[in-house]
Amino acid sequence: MTTFLYLFYLSWSDDGQWDADIFNGHAIGCNAVSWAPAILPGSLITPQPQAAPGQTQSSPTSSVKRFASAGCDNLVKIWGYREDSQSWAEEETLEGHTDWVRDVAWAPNVGLPRSYVATASQDKTVLIWTKDTPTAPWVKTALDPSTSLAPTSGAPPPPGKFPDVVWRVSWSLAGNLLAVSCGDGRVTLWKENLKGVWECVSDMNS
């Protein structure tokens, strides 16, 4: 029998009370969650269609309720809030890691044309998940430290692998720079170049 650990969502209500939504999350456990930006990618810079006569103009910045969770089942799950049922539902499952997913970070999207989610794993990899439109599939890309980082000791890790467990990932406020914290005591900064390739632009030792 598979045991699922629960996700708890707390919201502040108008009557001054905390409301709790509880739902099944990941088998074994959940290590991290990250909220999606409150607006869709590109909605602030994309011209919106004009409303027909007699209709209300829809807001280009309507609120989005969505988050990602990182699990001990090696999966990343995308959750969305359904207004019709007033409940949270699993929208998508992202498969790519072979060990516990330690962290997940959804990038801020102001000015960005697509969604970016970074995940860090016990399997020594960092995956960048991109989604071009709300209906497009998620596409994953692995960061490759072997092309830019010298090993601290011993043999270099294989392509696509960091030297140790990757514990944390964090985006800059602009959403175009990713910090990666590895178990070997190094923090690296990564940026996507004009060709769509992720490059290490800074390397710091603790």
Residue map of PLM features:
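Conserved strand-to-loop turn within each blade of WD40 beta-propeller repeats
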Residues: M1-F4, G29, S69-N74, T119-D123, ...
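WD40-repeat beta-propellers
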Residues: Y6-S13, V33, V76-Y81, V104, ...
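Residue-level recognition of a conserved intra-blade site in WD40 beta-propeller repeats
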Residues: W35, P60, W106, V110-G111, ...
